[in-house]
Amino acid sequence: MAMGPREGGGGGSAFGFSTRQVVVAGIIGGIALFLGATRLGFIPVPIPLIGNATIMHIPAVVGGALEGPVVGLLAGLIFGVFSFLYAESPIFANPLIAILPRLLIGVVAWAVFIGLRRFSVDLASVAAGVFGSLTNSVGVVGLAVLFGFLPLAVVPTLIPQVIAEAVLAAVVTIVVVRGVLLVRSGRTTAPEVSSDEERRY
């Protein structure tokens, strides 16, 4: 597929940034930095077997769904770096566990979103939120078990936290995506992705 210059810009192209993508990447990155630096993105839980609960994955999910895998990857990188630098569990002192799954959050969210948006933008948004969040949770837990930080027997006790994070990501993603599409279209009801918007992916 030819990757020539694009006008206006938009999410979804795996390579090359439009002006809009640069702006959105800056905003998403700023939000991720704020959540990480203030620790507002990390929510203490009574039994932190795999560290705190988090909303840090949400900027990566939204960035990936709206503006493509590179924006999502950058937001995920910020999430991973903060997890590593401020590790409150030995699990996240391992950079592979702290960073690698987070790099994939936005990429998976993007892939799911572009795969489902032809059926429904709302469905695509919810699925991107869920699968992006599960990429983080399953990746972290899987690597923690693999490296011996977490006994396999305790994994079922983590399911409520995993579900809560996935539901939150789904809700926020659909709200943000609908809002952004409304702003872009100038309508009062959220449109489906237009043919012009399709080309941006």
Describe every region a protein language model picked out.
Residues 103, 107, 111, 130-145:
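Mid-bilayer segments of alpha-helical transmembrane spans in multi-pass integral membrane proteins
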Residues 22-26, 58, 69-77, 95-100, ...:
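Hydrophobic alpha-helical transmembrane segments
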